[in-house]
């Protein structure tokens, strides 16, 4: 079973990781000196090189290959962390770093839980690659967008109760210091066969977070700082384009025997492919945006802590369509076995307070289901071919509004 929101590695990438595994680990971590930049400062940052590698995906070693010797890169080394905190004046009087370790299996970023003599907190750093698979480049400045989200949330009534607090931010190092929601767990276990699913109260809280965000973050001046064009482009590639590209290098049969043939049938459906492309164009179009949205509203971004729901990882946020957040939520409710009545109830709760395009929600949800089954970002699921066939049939029904021949071919 793969870990939460893992990346399937296309053919030709494995040799890169094997080569890195054989290389001597290089410790090139330089502790930054100087003072922390103001949280309100957004300095110009050099463009990210197109392809970067580190060995940090291998059991998360303390040593990482740093191709940017002028930059600080976070590790679990106490001297590494203590030096950063001291230089940024983030430690309280008499506070000493005692322990540090990885906080969960983060996919995109380096996330470390730090325990001191006074407290615990989370350090989260974006790097110019995907943390779990550094053969994939990623927008380096995504941490700046995430920090902006937390800062804006502080001025939106009712929103901060759903979010961990942003304690400090160093934009030059793309590093956030966040409240530690101790003993929290995400909801990726929802996909398991024995999962009881979300309680009604949990689904209500998930919908209410979106209602507060979408209704209160509509000011036109939010559009430029939350364009997030690079992250949106990255998401577009992995959601709307790569899964339906026949030469994408993904060995789907290695994931589930027979899945490759199923995907091929879907890719050759001209009407389906055209509709997905049109939806992708709408997703990318900045003129479509009406409010600030989370952008990646799936169970890996939902936490249960202190008896309630929290929402994390808004790095994919942008000024966009509220239907996108609702669609991602609905898609994952489908994939985690929630009933249509439960999904409709959630959407109805939102619709009672805000007008949305239910048909657009359905279409976006269908695309999300498709990309999670035949795309790079695989989910931690044990679904066999029959279940994946049912879900891909549902994807086609949601996207183009007709029953799919896939189910007749593979299940009858």
Q: Where in the sequence are the language-model features?
A:
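Conserved NTP-binding catalytic cores of kinases and kinase-like/nucleotidyltransferase enzymes
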Residues: 15, 51-172, 306, 401-412
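Conserved short submotifs of the Hanks-type protein kinase catalytic core
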Residues: 175-185
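Helical subdomain adjoining the active site within ATP-dependent kinase catalytic cores
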Residues: 358-363, 368-412
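Conserved kinase catalytic-core helix
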Residues: 187-227
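Active-site catalytic-loop/activation-segment of kinase and kinase-like phosphoryl-transfer enzymes
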Residues: 60-78, 225-281, 374
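Active-site Asp-x-Gly
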Residues: 133-135, 142, 291-292, 303-344
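Conserved catalytic-loop position in the HRD/HxD motif
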Residues: 296
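Active-site activation/catalytic loop segments of kinase-like enzymes and analogous catalytic loops
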Residues: 148, 322-353, 365-384
């Amino acid at each position: 079973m793969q870990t939460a929101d893992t990346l399937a590695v296309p053919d030709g990438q494995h040799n890169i990781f094997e080569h890195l595994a054989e290389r001597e680990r290089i410790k090139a971590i330089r502790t930054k000196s100087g003072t922390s930049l103001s949280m309100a400062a957004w300095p110009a940052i050099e463009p990210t090189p197109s392809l970067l590698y580190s060995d940090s995906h291998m059991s998360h070693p303390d040593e990482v290959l740093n191709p940017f010797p002028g930059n600080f890169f976070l590790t679990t080394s106490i001297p590494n962390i203590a030096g950063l905190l001291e230089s940024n004046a983030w430690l309280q009087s008499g506070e000493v770093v005692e322990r540090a370790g990885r906080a969960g299996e983060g996919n995109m970023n380096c996330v470390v839980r730090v325990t001191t003599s006074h407290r615990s907190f989370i350090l989260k750093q974006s790097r110019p690659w995907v943390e779990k698979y550094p053969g994939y480049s990623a927008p380096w400045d995504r941490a700046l967008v995430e920090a902006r989200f937390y800062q804006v949330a502080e001025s939106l009534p009712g929103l901060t109760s759903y979010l961990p607090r942003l304690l400090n931010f160093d934009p030059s190092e793309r590093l956030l210091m966040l409240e530690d929601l101790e003993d929290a767990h995400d909801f990726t276990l929802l996909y398991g066969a024995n999962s009881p699913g979300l309680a009604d109260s949990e689904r209500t809280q998930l919908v209410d977070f979106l209602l507060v965000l979408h209704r209160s973050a509509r000011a036109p001046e939010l559009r430029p700082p939350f364009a997030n064009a690079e992250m949106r482009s990255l998401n577009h590639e992995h959601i709307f384009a790569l899964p339906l590209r026949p030469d994408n290098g993904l060995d789907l049969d290695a994931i589930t025997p027979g899945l490759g043939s199923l995907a091929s049938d879907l890719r050759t459906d001209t009407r389906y492919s055209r509709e997905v492309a049109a939806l992708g164009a709408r997703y990318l179009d900045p003129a479509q945006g009406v409010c600030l949205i989370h952008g990646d509203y799936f169970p890996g971004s939902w936490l249960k802590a202190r008896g309630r729901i929290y929402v994390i990882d808004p790095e994919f946020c942008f000024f966009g369509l509220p239907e996108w957040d609702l669609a991602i939520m609905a898609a994952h409710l489908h994939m985690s076995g929630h009933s249509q009545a439960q999904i409709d109830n959630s959407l109805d709760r939102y619709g009672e307070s805000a007008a949305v395009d239910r048909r657009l929600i359905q279409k976006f949800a269908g695309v999300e289901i498709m990309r999670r089954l035949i795309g790079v970002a695989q989910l931690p699921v044990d679904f066999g071919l029959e279940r994946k066939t049912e879900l891909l049939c549902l994807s086609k029904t949601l996207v183009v509004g007709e029953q799919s021949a896939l189910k007749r071919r593979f299940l009858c």
